Amino acid sequence: KCLSIGIDITKEYIPVAPAAHYLCGGIKVDLDGQSSIRRLYAIGECSCTGLHGGNRLASNSLIEAVVYADAAAKHALSVLERYDFNEDIPEWNDEGTISTEERVLITQSMKEVNQIMEAYVGIVRSNTRLTRAWNRLDILYEETEALFKRSKATRELCELRNMINVGYLITKQAMEQTNKKPMN
């Protein structure tokens, strides 16, 4: 197979790149599927229950997802009546903003976030790479916030802001991590 795509494994390495699916993690939850943020639940691949230890990709076992989904739903229903909900939400006011004609700016910035995270915050990490990632994300953040303030909020623009914020969170956690255990 490798030869058919131009890679001679007797003369060169097989290129390997990190992919999001292979990174372990998730939102730490309790037995009710609730995160450290009150009333925020996480189940399935976005959660980290610890049920299977460190050798599982997040918490993506089907049985685990079903059990935690059931627990989260039961817990949420049991506390639902304790909370008031604000139903008096004003209409969105985008007066003074313009439609984002420059979609290419958003698309390119999304590609840059992906490239930054793959190149500097992937499997192989160093303080130099993490610092570079942080600085690059900072530039993208400033550019995106400026665009957001003058544009109508679109799904793509909101997703870009979220991508940058998640990039910041992952990078910050990686910079603070002192216990670098390999996964089993």
Q: Where do the PLM segments sit?
A:
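Glycine- and aromatic-enriched mobile tails/lids
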Residues: 22, 28-42, 46-184
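C-terminal catalytic lobe of FAD-dependent flavoproteins
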Residues: 1-24, 37-39
